[in-house]
Swiss-Prot record:
Cellular compartment(s): Cytoplasm
Top EC class for this record: lyase
InterPro entries xref list: Asp_de-COase-like_dom_sf, Asp_decarbox
Main location: cytoplasm
Signal peptide: none
Binding note for cofactor: Binds 1 pyruvoyl group covalently per subunit.
Protein name as catalogued: Aspartate 1-decarboxylase
Annotated SUPFAM superfamilies: ADC-like
Record's GO cellular component terms: cytosol
Pyruvic acid (Ser): modified positions: 25
Role summary: Catalyzes the pyruvoyl-dependent decarboxylation of aspartate to produce beta-alanine.
Complexes and interactors: Heterooctamer of four alpha and four beta subunits.
Post-translational modification remark: Is synthesized initially as an inactive proenzyme, which is activated by self-cleavage at a specific serine bond to produce a beta-subunit with a hydroxyl group at its C-terminus and an alpha-subunit with a pyruvoyl group at its N-terminus.
Gene it is expressed from: panD
Length: 138
């Protein structure tokens, strides 16, 4: 049996551009793609924290060090520049693969620069003001 598990997450990135007239996809800074273990062409989900929209597309490598998070094509009708998003990649793992399973969770600042890298999907960075889903009362 294969299980579909979280593989990659870029948490609370800020959308820097959106253009209807691009080929559909999401352009992501190469540094963030590398940190999150996302490859060009890989299927990703994007969740818009500001409006609740969720969509599936694929990743395109953006210029390294620019912090670009670009929403391209029809998705630009659902997600706008300035919106906070979560970019998620999944993979299928066998029971054997799961013995060594760890996700890559990348937290970024307001300029989409990496501030923390972890492997726990429920991780909450210190001082972020976010709630831990395992301990919401804390």
């Amino acid at each position: 049996m294969l299980r579909t598990m979280l593989k990659s997450k870029i948490h609370r990135a800020t959308v820097t551009q959106a253009d209807l007239h691009y080929v559909g996809s999401c352009t992501i800074d190469a540094d963030l793609m590398e940190a999150a273990d996302i490859l060009e062409g890989e299927q990703i989900d994007i969740v818009d924290i500001d409006n609740g929209n969720r969509l599936t597309t694929y990743a395109i490598t953006g210029d390294r060090g620019t912090g670009v998070i670009g929403i391209n094509g029809a998705a630009a009708r659902l997600i706008s520049p300035g919106d906070l998003v979560i970019i998620i990649g999944y993979a299928q793992y066998s029971e054997e693969d799961l013995k060594n399973y760890a996700s890559r969770v990348v937290f970024v600042d307001g300029n989409n620069k990496q501030v923390e890298l972890g492997g726990d999907p429920a991780q909450v960075p210190d001082g972020s003001g976010l709630k831990n889903p395992r301990h919401p009362e804390a």
